């Protein structure tokens, strides 16, 4: 909870007759949506919501975003129980917003972020063994279609060199020609080609739907904003189902949407692929 002193400071910072921080962020979000940069728009939206809570709804001009303000916001995030990487995420977004404001001459160049962490701590990459992959594949999920889909997506990712969930969600039938999957990673734009091996083909055929352009029943529309919202809901649901699958395996493990990618990389390294 904000102190009386902090509340008084925020009220005194409220901007008049200039572009304020939250207003500027809303404009940036609108521009990103118009450019179909929906992932970045989503991150800005999360940060704006968080910052609005910190400011208790009182918008401020960029001239008031100084080292003291950033320090108080940093402390606010920590008090909410966020880990260092999460705090850094919000700081990096706000720094990007601030730098855009500098380029648009809304504020004089400065660096109020000097005393806060804006890096990314390395997290432990959790891979599972080929034995666990085999156990997962053999699970009888005939009466649990949602779990079966989550399992099949995980196996598909593993068999396609760790294809990311976002790329699986957006994968279309048109991406498959002459027994080869070709697609561009949505994160990097990197073009990849993967041969459709029997295990991959079996999963693709299991979810074939004549009326859908997509390979898997994850997205239902090609409209960018609606498709992105469906993807956001789907990845959360996918990770929830993977937690349930983890509890069904004999070996103690934790499956996430990243595990299949790390597991493939580990297996490839072990086999000198």
Q: Where do the PLM segments sit?
A:
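Conserved tyrosine-mediated DNA breakage-rejoining catalytic core shared by Y-recombinases
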Residues: 115, 170-206
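Short, charged phosphate-coordinating catalytic segments
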Residues: 99-107, 157-178
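Active-site/catalytic core of tyrosine-dependent DNA strand-transfer enzymes
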Residues: 133, 197-252
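DNA breakage-rejoining catalytic core of tyrosine-based enzymes
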Residues: 64, 107, 120-138, 190-197, ...
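Basic, Lys/Arg- and aromatic-enriched nucleic-acid-binding interface segment
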Residues: 116-165
């Amino acid at each position: 909870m904000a102190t009386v002193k902090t509340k008084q400071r925020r009220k005194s910072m409220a901007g008049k007759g200039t572009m304020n921080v939250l207003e500027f962020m809303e404009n940036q979000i609108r521009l990103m949506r118009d450019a179909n940069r929906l992932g970045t728009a989503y991150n800005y939206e999360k940060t704006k919501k968080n910052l609005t809570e910190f400011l208790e709804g009182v918008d401020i001009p960029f001239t008031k975003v100084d080292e003291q303000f950033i320090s108080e916001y940093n402390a606010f995030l920590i008090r909410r129980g966020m880990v260092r990487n999460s705090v850094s995420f919000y700081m990096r977004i706000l720094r990007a917003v601030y730098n855009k404001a500098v380029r648009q001459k809304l504020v004089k160049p400065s660096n109020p972020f000097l005393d806060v962490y804006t890096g990314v701590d390395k997290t432990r990459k959790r891979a599972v063994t080929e034995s666990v992959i085999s156990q997962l594949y053999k699970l009888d999920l005939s009466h649990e279609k949602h779990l079966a889909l989550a399992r099949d997506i995980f196996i598909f990712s593993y068999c396609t060199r760790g294809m990311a969930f976002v790329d699986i969600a957006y994968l279309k039938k048109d991406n498959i020609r002459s027994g080869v999957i070709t697609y561009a990673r949505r994160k990097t734009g990197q073009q990849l080609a993967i041969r459709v091996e029997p295990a991959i083909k079996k999963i693709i055929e299991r979810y074939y739907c004549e009326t859908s352009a997509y390979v898997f029943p994850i997205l239902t529309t090609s409209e960018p904003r609606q498709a992105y919202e469906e993807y956001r809901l789907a990845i959360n649901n996918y990770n929830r189902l993977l937690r349930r699958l983890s509890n069904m395996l004999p070996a103690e493990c934790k499956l996430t949407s990243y595990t299949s990618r790390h597991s493939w990389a580990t297996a490839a390294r072990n086999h000198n692929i």
